[in-house]
Amino acid sequence: MATSVIQFGSFVCNLPKSQPLCTTVHCPKQSMSTNIVRPSDPFAELEKHLEPYLQKRMDATIRQTKGGTLVYKHMSEAKRARKLRKKQREEEEVRLFMNAAPYIVSNITIGGGEVPSKMEEVSIKRPLNKTPSRKIKKSLTPVTFRDGHMNKFLRELRDCATRNSMTVHLIGKRKTELAFKRRASLNAVYATLHHMRGVDRKRDIVLEEWMNDYVLNLSKVSTWGSLFHAESLKRGDSGLILNARALRGKFGRCSRGFFIVRGKSDGVVLDARSKLSMATVTHMEQYSTPEAFWSGLEKKWSVVRKPTAHTCKPTYSVSNCGEVAAIIAQALFPCHKLTCGECSKEICDLTSNECVQELYKNTSLALERMNNLHPEFQHIVKVLSVVRQLTEASNHGTETFDEIFKMIGSKTQSPFTHLNKLNEFMLKGNENTSGEWLTARQHLRELVRFQKNRTDNIKKGDLASFRNKLSARAQYNLYLSCDNQLDKNASFLWGQREYHARRFFLNFFQQIDPSKGYLAYEDRTIPNGSRKLAIGNLIVPLDLAEFRKRMNGIDTQQPPIGKYCTSQLDGNFVYPCCCTTLDDGQPIRSAVYAPTKKHLVVGNTGDTKYINLPKGDTEMLYIALDGYCYINIYLAMLVNISEEEAKDFTKKVRDIFMPKLGKWPTLMDLATTCAQLRIFHPDVHDAELPRILVDHNTQTCHVVDSYGSISTGYHILKAATVSQLVLFADDNLESEIKHYRVGGIVENHKVQIDNQPSRCGVSEFHAIRMLIKGIYRPSVMYELLSEEPYLLVFSILSPSILIAMYNDRAFELAVQIWLEKEQSIPLIATILTNLAAKVSVATTLVQQLQLIELSADQLLNVTCDGFRVSFAYQSALTLLTRMRDQAKANSELISGGFNEYDQDLAWTLEKKLSRPLTRPMERIKLAGKISLLLVLKKAKDSFAVKYQKQKFARCQRNIQFITETIYGKGFLPHESRSSVHQARN
């Protein structure tokens, strides 16, 4: 008998195996009919097709969207792959465990360590030594809140609020207020709307979704069952909540079974929850009452009112008081609505002067209304009269102010400073503050003291006691001591100023040619003499005796101190504008100034400062042109200019001031330009100047550059900064030095001492030449439009040039360049484009010129746009002004039917101006002409072969015209003509 063995630990059990009774079971085979057709599963194919999707859905989870829809959230393919691999690993572990050979389990441990029960410490439990509590614990039944309880709570809340006229707040994202009030002996519920607070909204109230049921429940008071007709609603019913089924008449749409009254529009009562347009909101009748206004007025009136000793009695009617209050409110705070924020903003945006003017105008109008409507309110009339009197403008004397300012505005000495302050005080009038009144009284006191202490026995202008010593302390320049402006060697960093300084070096400096030697540049010729530079000392002899010999200068024998050395203003010396003296009154005479290479030397007090000149394109030395040595003053001012303003500064000097000054300007004109530059660039007021030597023999001021001076004995001007130099620009300054000339060689010079400035800008002839040059050279046109865009205006001088620039798309190019930089230039180009289109349609030259003149006024308004740093700007304004005035003067002749143009003269001028347009090939070389001729001939031949004879004749005439225009009539060679004839045949 076979047995089975089961072993567990040390136990072994032998079990007998029972023999099977029957090992084989025979079943008779049933015969199957082959003719039976089994039905096929209709969903087998569908299930097979959907099997991947259903298998994927087995791993999906269910989630709910914001709309409440339940959807499947499928796993990503990577996550499903990880899950499948994990499942396969688990199945593999189970399979391996089940197929493992039998083994004996002799010990079971946790973590391979000792049994936890053996690790516990045995503790002896002792009873607690305390008195047992006799308190009986009560078990409280938890409060449960059901739907019925909530309805009961709302009913009790509604009854309580109705009895006590309370306000219920429903608080969600926003707060909604429901006020329980009495209306015509019935209880009613009112919702607080936006327009009741003075705020107009498209939706007067916004209820959250959960609030609708609560509002419906709380609104079921005594008015809920009453019928309401649309005509029965009136002011004061805003926010009233009514039963939607109990409404009769014209009512707007509503929802949730209740209607919140807002107002009436076009006879229809509207729900406050409905969204309306702002036009409807503005014009509709809203059923609110001014209770909030009156409650606020009554609340604050008792607090801020004036205390009185008498008993107040009602003398004036309430209606009249309301009208008077409206007049006063409009007089002080003119607005359309008191609650409008835009009206209040308009008042806040007014300046103080505008506010005073509006107050004067409104109080005058209010006084007129009070006298006509309510003259019995005399106290109101008196107060308004006082306000109008205080706000009346008292600063009409601008002509007097201008006259006083012209006489003493530039004077900075007492008592003129006090007079100028009082003049400014009088101009401001009622705008003066209490502090300014106190300051004006102090200035008046100083004037009284001056007049009292003034005596005529003080001797002025006595040169016997004149002393003007040079300060031993050097001028401190922050720009030369700031670490950010210096490199590691403490040298000044020009930065972007170095690039823009090239405008000075390219136009007003020349390179020193070493082949000529330094001696060729040693003599600086002046109209009445010469001055020797120390440039020859750049070659240093090693012989000490020779070097000492070169250190000796050439004395110029200048005169002693005299009136010509001084400058006076009102009898007082202006010391910065005088020559310097020693302690004994003798003039300080200049010594030999040693030369340096590529340095700018500034400062005339103490130790001079040496600044490295901006680097040029080459390593050659530069020297100022004859007559332009004063350019070193502008170069010294450039040190104090910021890098962002360097371009603007250098262009102003080159394009505006240098053409005015030219060669040999007077010191007065030079100081005037410095004063003008100081307005645009205030940082230059303390810029240090180079040494200025005064030559009284030749009445010349020499600006010493880096090459020094061998000529000695000159007087030294004390002015060391720009702010001191501009003192020479005063017409009232009594000085001979201010008429001295500054610079180099003079050519046909005429001293200009009047107040008329020299003309600067570009002539019309040169402007036309530049435009014509740009028409045939796109690069030149681009450069002209980038640097001098106002040259476009000169195209109106000739209709032919205007049309040529239009065809060349020059105006479109100007718009592209300046559209994002300056708005006036694209506008000018647009006007000229439209003008060119009109001119091209005109049939006669006179009509074209008339069209151009009529557009001059519009162009002038657009072009005149403040100060512009442009060489052609002032000339363009002059041209447009002349054409505008000419058009106005000729308007009467045109209206009378007369032609103000001389036909022959107009044709002559137009022919002269447009002549360069018809001869653009005059300067082209012969090779270029031959090349162009071959191109034209090839074009004729190809056209003749391809097209008909009639079309070819037209093409031949056009090409003939182009050729004659370029080369002149009859230029087409005989060979070319014969080839054309053969091609035609």
Swiss-Prot record:
InterPro entries: HC-pro, HC_PRO_CPD_dom, HC_PRO_CPD_sf, Pept_S30_P1_potyvir, Potyvirid-P3. Its EC number is 3.4.21.-, 3.4.22.45. Residues 621-743 form the Peptidase C6 domain. One of its GO terms (molecular function) is cysteine-type endopeptidase activity. Residues 144-287 form the Peptidase S30 domain. It holds the Pfam family Peptidase_S30. The active site is at 195 (for p1 proteinase activity), 204 (for p1 proteinase activity), 238 (for p1 proteinase activity), 629 (for helper component proteinase activity), 702 (for helper component proteinase activity). A motif (Involved in virions binding and aphid transmission) lies at residues 595-597. Potyviral RNA is expressed as two polyproteins which undergo post-translational proteolytic processing. Genome polyprotein is processed by NIa-pro, P1 and HC-pro proteinases resulting in the production of at least ten individual proteins. P3N-PIPO is cleaved by P1 and HC-pro proteinases resulting in the production of three individual proteins. The P1 proteinase and the HC-pro cleave only their respective C-termini autocatalytically. A motif (Involved in interaction with stylet and aphid transmission) lies at residues 337-340. The keyword Transport applies. Keywords: Host cell junction, Host-virus interaction, Hydrolase, Inhibition of host innate immune response by virus, Protease, Serine protease, Suppressor of RNA silencing, Transport, Viral immunoevasion, Viral movement protein. The N-terminus of helper component proteinase is involved in interaction with stylets. The central part is involved in interaction with virions and the C-terminus is involved in cell-to cell movement of the virus. This is P3N-PIPO polyprotein. It comes from Pepper mottle virus (isolate California) (PeMV).
